[in-house]
Amino acid sequence: MSPVVKGASAAAAATGIVAACAVVLLGASGEQPVHPFPTVGVLMAGGEHWCTASVVDSPRGNVVATAAHCVAPAGEDGVPGEVAHDGLAIGELSFAPAFSGEGSGTQPLGVWKVRSVHVDERWTKWGDETADFAFLTIEPDEDGRSVQEAVGRGEAPAPDWTSGYEREVTVIGYPESEHNPQNKPVSCTTQSRHDLDDPDMLYINCSGFWTGTSGSPWIADRGGTGQPGRLIGVLSGGETDVDSTAALYDEKAKALYERAAKG
């Protein structure tokens, strides 16, 4: 059964569903802006932005994680779905970490071109929600920097392929502007568990995770500076803003990540 998505499903993306953005906090006069979640941002194409995505630690610093339904249509009965958003062409898709501000917003850490998208065929052929995750290979900027260097290499969580379901997790997402006119990030630290409706999925109960938060990272063991934690999955869906689910990373997710990391 396909999830009730909170980001850009193919149909939602076609209508320009907008994901909200990470707020930028200004320090005292003369100080540099502080980005509370520099690794997390939004996907962009054709001047629109939707869904949440985040930098995950990788050898080359070039990998971003999001939900599969944000970048690829769900298949059914072995037949791939139809792409409903022209911007999903690889040449146009990009990632803006720490995206912020009202309206069209700003991109304080730049806009990074997506080189390739890596999605499990369980999603593209069958719409299997337990495979609703994707990894994106990001091109370096004109100076040769990786996206991970731009957001801070010590800030990105490492992936965890063998996590259990019951973890203390921090989830960070960007609700659409209808529910978040100031475009401030929503975050929640709570206990994850099996979803009662689908025990193969992770579940949390936290308010404020409206449409636009699909792809939000679920980070276990997140601490202070130098303790970015472990990424165990990304937000997939949920019936309400209070109920959120995620597909737990597995060995197939690891294979996708490794493919993305090779560039």
Regions found by a protein language model. Give the residues of each.
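Secretory targeting and sorting signals
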Residues: 1-28
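Conserved catalytic-core segment of clan PA serine endopeptidases
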Residues: 30-38, 49, 81-144
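Catalytic histidine site
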Residues: 31, 35-100, 191-197, 206-207
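Structural recognition of the beta-strand scaffold that forms the well-ordered cores
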Residues: 42, 63-65, 94-96, 134-137, ...
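Solvent-exposed loop/turn segments at secondary-structure junctions
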Residues: 48-50, 60-61, 70-73, 101-103, ...
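Chymotrypsin/trypsin-fold serine protease catalytic domain
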Residues: 129-205
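Catalytic nucleophile loop of clan PA
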Residues: 208-234
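C-terminal cap/linker of serine protease catalytic domains
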Residues: 232, 238-263
